[in-house]
């Protein structure tokens, strides 16, 4: 496909984006808004953002959800801006500095919350800064400006949603159904690999792919939930399927690890059974029916606990899968599965990374303020706004440097494109609303195609071009003002990029160590006799941390294996019949406190000391378990956990 070619699958969204822009433009001028540009810009960003992230037309519900987040972020930012102005209107410099800190604070929060919701906080940060900068000449008009900005943004969002509904957005339901079938086959094939006990790298690749696919399925569930309320039952089932899929991965990998020391546990009966290849979900269904008969014949005692647990989870997966595909009423058996255990939320391991993002945003905004005050440039305020926008949006993504480069390319492309519209097209079409709408529709159509290709600079070019062309009411054509705005955007992006390069993010290793220690803490916390604590479902949170570890350290197999081993230890100890008595309960509470100290330790010396204390306590715990005559289901996992922690002691404690 050529660089300027147009694929058929890209046309519908390009028309949708053009329609959203035209609707916002028409409504803005029809209701005599002072700056219809904000409505048009909002419609373009809300519609194009999900398409750029997806690399194609977004699924149904994505644009609505992004619009909802934008409304929330705008209102939070407007309220914060009003509070800052009311409190500090007599000290303008201090007011701007507080706004810079507010933008940094919002970036800090957006780095810690779910990536889907971080957009609202990033927006809240720079909205307050936009309000404070814009009202500098006339502070008394602050409430009016805040109300107008909110109104224009809501109009833009409504127009984007109307355009999305008008062109029948894609439903993700069929993709979910296909992935459920395919994922079950992949789970069975992973178990086959683990029972064969072949090449470790092949097994590592297989379970790593399954972790990614399960995480992707969870993202599809979020999309389906946004799409329509009629998928509420399917959403409940998919949430339980996420845990079941992770359970299947855990049991398969434990089957592989058990054979490293005790290969005789997997009998020839099961080895021969899992030799039969499967290609479809129907093949897996037949094999599971046969496998349940084999287990009924051999008995639960003669069946390895990992295979028994795997079959139980796969059977539940199958039952819920049928319910998701048909979206029928939830029956009593499904309801029993769905009641399940409450999921546990873990503390973010990226606090240091979030603090780096705070300083990047705050320092870049302060640098923009100093540049504005030092030069006295009329468009210094525009540069400041772009600095806040770039840093607020870039920091929450995995590669902020590339986001900043995208904005630089976009603002550079917007200069000639905006010049064409400012000097030629808009002056010749402003007398006709139809011609004006057609001219902007053409811009939206072609940039909409490039956005779907994820072309570098396409998203920045769309937003920057709309921002600098004259879409005010009434239209005024001052070339110096246009040039200032265009250059202000470029300078702001370059300054933001400079700060991102200078304030380096060296938090990766620290985040990795915190994640690994959180796995250790989870394994230790499973040693409890508290019934409520044992019913807590840690699995989704643990695999979410594992997925983050895989993204932070791609290809680092030793780290992945260590994390997976800790997850397996957690699951095994959680189900182990630990003797119930006050002595063990008190000692396990002490061990959990020590594990928490390992995570929270700020220096290597403290971390080593607490980790050494944890190892000593694990040795004492093994002795106590022998005294209290704990069964092998308890002593063996504790012994394996202690051995793993001794082996990887330096990796878990040293910076």
From Swiss-Prot:
UniProt entry tagged with the keyword Cell inner membrane: yes
Signal peptide: none
Sequence intervals crossing the membrane: 13-33, 38-58, 69-89, 93-113, 121-141, 152-172, 370-390, 407-427, 431-451, 459-479, 482-502
Keywords assigned: Cell inner membrane, Cell membrane, Membrane, Transmembrane, Transmembrane helix, Transport
BP-aspect Gene Ontology terms: carboxylic acid transport
Coiled coil start-end: none
InterPro entries, per the entry: PHBA_efflux_AaeB/fusaric-R, PHBA_efflux_pump_AaeB
Induction of synthesis: Positively coregulated with aaeA and aaeX by AaeR.
Domain of life where this protein originates: Bacteria
Subcellular location, principal: membrane
Record topology, Periplasmic segments: 1-12, 59-68, 114-120, 173-369, 428-430, 480-481
Membrane topology: Multi-pass membrane protein
UniProt GO cellular component terms: plasma membrane
Cytoplasmic side: 34-37, 90-92, 142-151, 391-406, 452-458, 503-655
UniProt-listed Pfam families: FUSC
Localization annotation: Cell inner membrane
GO molecular function: transmembrane transporter activity
PANTHER family cross-referenced by the UniProt entry: MULTIDRUG RESISTANCE PROTEIN MDTO, P-HYDROXYBENZOIC ACID EFFLUX PUMP SUBUNIT-RELATED
Family recorded in the similarity comment: Belongs to the aromatic acid exporter ArAE (TC 2.A.85) family.
Main function: Forms an efflux pump with AaeA. Could function as a metabolic relief valve, allowing to eliminate certain compounds when they accumulate to high levels in the cell.
Protein name: p-hydroxybenzoic acid efflux pump subunit AaeB
Taxonomic source organism: Escherichia coli O6:H1 (strain CFT073 / ATCC 700928 / UPEC)
Gene: aaeB
């Amino acid at each position: 496909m050529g660089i300027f070619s147009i694929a058929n699958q890209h046309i519908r969204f390009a028309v949708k984006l053009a329609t959203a822009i035209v609707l916002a433009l028409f409504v803005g001028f029809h209701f005599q808004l002072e700056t219809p540009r904000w409505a048009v810009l909002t419609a373009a960003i809300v519609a194009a953002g999900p398409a750029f992230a997806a690399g194609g037309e977004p699924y149904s519900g994505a644009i609505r959800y992004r619009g909802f987040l934008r409304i929330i972020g705008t209102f939070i930012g407007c309220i914060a801006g009003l509070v800052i102005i009311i409190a500090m209107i007599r000290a303008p410099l201090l007011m701007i500095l507080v706004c810079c800190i507010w933008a940094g604070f919002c970036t800090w929060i957006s780095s810690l919350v779910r990536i889907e919701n971080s957009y609202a906080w990033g927006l809240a940060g720079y909205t307050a800064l936009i309000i404070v900068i814009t009202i500098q000449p006339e502070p008394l008009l602050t409430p009016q400006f805040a109300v107008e900005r909110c109104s224009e943004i809501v109009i833009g969002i409504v127009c984007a949603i109307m355009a999305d509904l008008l062109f029948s957005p894609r439903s993700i339901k069929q993709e979910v159904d296909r992935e459920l079938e395919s994922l079950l086959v992949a789970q069975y094939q992973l178990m086959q690999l683990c029972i064969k006990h072949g090449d470790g790298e092949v097994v590592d690749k297989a379970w790593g792919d399954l972790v990614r696919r399960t995480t992707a399925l969870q993202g599809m569930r979020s999309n389906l939930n946004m799409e329509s309320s009629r998928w509420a039952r399917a959403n409940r089932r998919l949430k339980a399927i996420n845990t079941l899929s992770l359970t299947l991965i855990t049991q398969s990998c434990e089957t592989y690890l058990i054979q490293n020391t005790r290969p005789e546990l997997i009998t020839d009966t099961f080895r021969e059974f899992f030799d039969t290849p499967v290609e479809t979900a129907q093949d897996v269904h037949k094999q599971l029916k046969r496998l349940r008969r084999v287990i009924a014949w051999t008995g639960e005692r003669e069946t390895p606990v990992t295979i028994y647990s795997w079959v139980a989870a796969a059977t539940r997966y199958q039952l819920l899968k049928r319910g998701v595909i048909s979206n029928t009423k939830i029956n009593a058996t499904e309801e029993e599965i769905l009641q399940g255990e409450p999921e546990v939320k873990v503390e973010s391991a990226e606090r240091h990374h979030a603090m780096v993002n705070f300083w990047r945003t705050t320092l870049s905004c302060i640098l923009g303020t100093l540049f504005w005050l030092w030069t006295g440039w009329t468009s210094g305020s525009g540069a400041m706004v772009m600095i806040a926008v770039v840093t607020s949006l870039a920091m929450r993504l995995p590669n902020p440097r590339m986001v900043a480069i995208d904005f630089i390319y976009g603002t550079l492309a917007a200069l000639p494109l905006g010049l064409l519209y400012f000097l030629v097209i808009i002056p010749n079409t402003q007398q006709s609303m139809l011609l004006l709408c057609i001219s902007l529709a053409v811009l939206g159509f072609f940039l909409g195609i490039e956005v779907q290709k994820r072309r570098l600079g396409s998203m920045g070019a769309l937003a920057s071009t709309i921002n600098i062309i004259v879409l005010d009411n009434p239209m005024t054509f001052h070339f110096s003002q246009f040039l200032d705005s265009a250059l202000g955007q470029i300078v702001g992006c370059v300054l933001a990029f400079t700060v991102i390069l200078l304030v380096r993010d060296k938090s990766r290793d620290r985040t990795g160590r915190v994640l690994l220690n959180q796995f250790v803490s989870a394994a230790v916390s499973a040693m409890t006799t508290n019934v409520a604590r044992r019913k807590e479902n840690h699995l989704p949170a643990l695999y979410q941390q594992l997925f983050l570890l895989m993204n932070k350290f791609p290809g680092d197999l030793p780290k992945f294996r260590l994390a997976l081993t800790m997850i397996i230890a957690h699951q095994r100890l959680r189900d182990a019949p630990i003797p119930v008595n006050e002595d063990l309960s008190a000692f396990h509470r002490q061990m959990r406190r020590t594990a928490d100290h390992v995570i929270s330790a700020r220096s290597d010396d403290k971390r080593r000391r607490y980790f050494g204390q944890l190892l000593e306590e694990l040795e004492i715990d093994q002795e106590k378990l022998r005294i209290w005559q704990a069964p092998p289901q308890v002593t063996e996992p504790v012994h394996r956990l202690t051995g793993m922690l001794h082996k990887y002691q330096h990796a878990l404690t040293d910076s």
